[in-house]
Amino acid sequence: MKVGQPVLQCQTNSEAFGMMQERRSGNYKPNIWKYDFLQSLSSKYDEEKYKTQAERLKEDAKHLFIEAVDLQGKLELVDCIIKVGLASHFKDEIKKALDTIASSIKNDKSDAIKNRYVTALCFRLLRQHGYEVSQAKKSDFLDENGTFLKAKSMDVKGVLELFEASYLALESENILDDAKAFSTTILKDINSATTESNLYKQVVHALELPFHWRVRWFDVKWHIKTFQKDKSINKTLLDLAKVNFNVVQATLQNDLKEISRWWRNLGLIENLKFSRDRLVESFLCTVGLVFEPQYSSFRRWLTKVVIMILVIDDVYDIYGSLEELQHFTNAINRWDTAELEQLPEYMKICFKTLHTITGETAHEMQREKRWDQEQTETHLKKVWADFCRALFVEAKWFNKGYTPSVQEYLKTACISSSGSLLSVHSFFLIMNEGTREMLHFLEKNQEMFYNISLIIRLCNDLGTSVAEQERGDAASSIVCHMREMEVLEEEARSYLKGIIGNYWKKVNEKCFTQSPEMQLFININVNMARVVHNLYQNRDGFGVQDHQNKKQILSLLVHPFKLD
């Protein structure tokens, strides 16, 4: 069966119908993003004249690096460029500016940076770009007694930047841990009546989710609108950011239209009514990983992977009987169509679709990236088999009514979260010219992928546990901790949020020290953790297509900026 052609139609009989009566339901709402609407998307910003306009504005904006002569000016320019989504356009200029800053700080033994806001901003930007920089010195934020300065001794911008910087902490950086606690307390006490409105909105935004944990592209519009109210921000830079956003959005619309045609022609969801039909949400996840226009192929192929993750997850979580799941897991492990005879029709459809997508992905990676097709397919089949085995373990827990310890839960969850599955697919989809050295890099960074996978799982649990408990799903990490430690849900949630913070520290150890040629892949993996923070922040981003989800999709994929 070719992906893009209709899948087999389900056959039902009285016995199968009897089994269907006992099936569980996820109670997922129908898809709200209809095919005709997606195909109607169009943008004038894919015209060449807007790309030319962006190039002209880009050349004009380069002068800003020359005009920014002092340390604070350089730092704020770099920060603004990153936040409005223009970092890829000014890579060389940003590197040159940060190289100069890092060198001047390293050679200056007089501790010349006295402005606490600048100290924190400098630390954050240097660390997130891979420069070796130690946690802020005690003298920068502590008084002579070794305690943090009182709120009245620090301006709001300084406290806010200290808060943001604290989220780039590594393990054992106790000063930054104290800085996070201190700045969080201060920011929560800030009154809107006594704080400039634009700054107050930034404080609220940061407390909802810190910048380091946010998906950069998802926040671009918010930052542009925020900077528009700041008279110190150069208008040319903001004009460029708006045009760039619209040009990128035009490419994303074309990507989405193409993948929606594939999805409709596939016909998979019509035969699997129990599963989530979430094409647009799946595509948006890939946009969160890498949004630049030149990565259209990556987004389209990885969207197919995300779609299959959702479908197979629903097979294990919601619909399949334990006996069926055993046969399905065996079939995936052996990757053998001979196993299909023991599978019900809906599982045959899942297996054949996955089999075809995986084969076509490996073939495409050989054509586009010069990876060995057989080698690629071997790696992809392995991560799918690992994923299904982990889901089967959780299905057995559910069927036995078993609640594991948190440690036992996480051992399986790091695989069932799909983090490693997405990492391996991303590796082959994004990296060029497969070599042993590159594959060694994949193996060498397993610890980072492991920590990102656990962030994915725990964020998922925090966002979906209420709905899962209502459905009677298997125990989440929240329930596991509640029962293991005999605590209430609120305490369990607080504990797991702390664990997420610790895993981020482990990720921080690895994600700022990679070589330039590997940095894109590392960024994609870190963005996986950021995407799930966005998806499951106070909601189930896949299960429920609520107002917040719809608003974000319309903003990022449908509505362009109005240009002056």
Curated annotation (Swiss-Prot):
Q: InterPro entries given for it? A: Isoprenoid_synthase_dom_sf (IPR008949), Terpene_cyclase-like_1_C (IPR034741), Terpene_cyclase_plant_C1 (IPR044814), Terpene_synth_N (IPR001906), Terpene_synth_N_sf (IPR036965), Terpene_synthase-like (IPR050148), Terpene_synthase_metal-bd (IPR005630), Terpenoid_cyclase/PrenylTrfase (IPR008930)
Cofactor binding, per record:
Binds 3 Mg(2+) ions per subunit.
Give me any GO biological process, just one: diterpenoid biosynthetic process
Instruction: From the UniProt record, list the reaction(s) this protein catalyses.
Output: (2E,6E)-farnesyl diphosphate = (3E,6E)-alpha-farnesene + diphosphate
UniProt xrefs under CDD domains? Terpene_cyclase_plant_C1 (cd00684)
Q: Name one Pfam family in it.
A: Terpene_synth
Q: For the motif DDXXD motif, give the residue ranges.
A: 313-317
Gene Ontology terms, MF aspect:
alpha-farnesene synthase activity; magnesium ion binding; sesquiterpene synthase activity
Task: Tell me its cofactors.
Answer: Mg(2+)
For this protein, the Enzyme Commission number is 4.2.3.46
Binding annotation for Mg(2+) 1: D313, D317
**Matching SUPFAM superfamilies, A to Z?**
Terpenoid cyclases/Protein prenyltransferases (SSF48239), Terpenoid synthases (SSF48576)
Provide the binding site for Mg(2+) 3. T464, E468
UniProt: Mg(2+) 2 binding residues = D313, D317
Top-level division of the source organism's lineage: Eukaryota
Transport listed as a keyword: no
Q: What is known of its domains?
A: The Asp-Asp-Xaa-Xaa-Asp/Glu (DDXXD/E) motif is important for the catalytic activity, presumably through binding to Mg(2+).
Give the family from UniProt.
Answer: Belongs to the terpene synthase family.
What is the protein's known function? Catalyzes the cyclization of farnesyl diphosphate to (E,E)-alpha-farnesene.
Name of the protein described by the UniProt record: Alpha-farnesene synthase
What is the native source organism of this protein? Ricinus communis
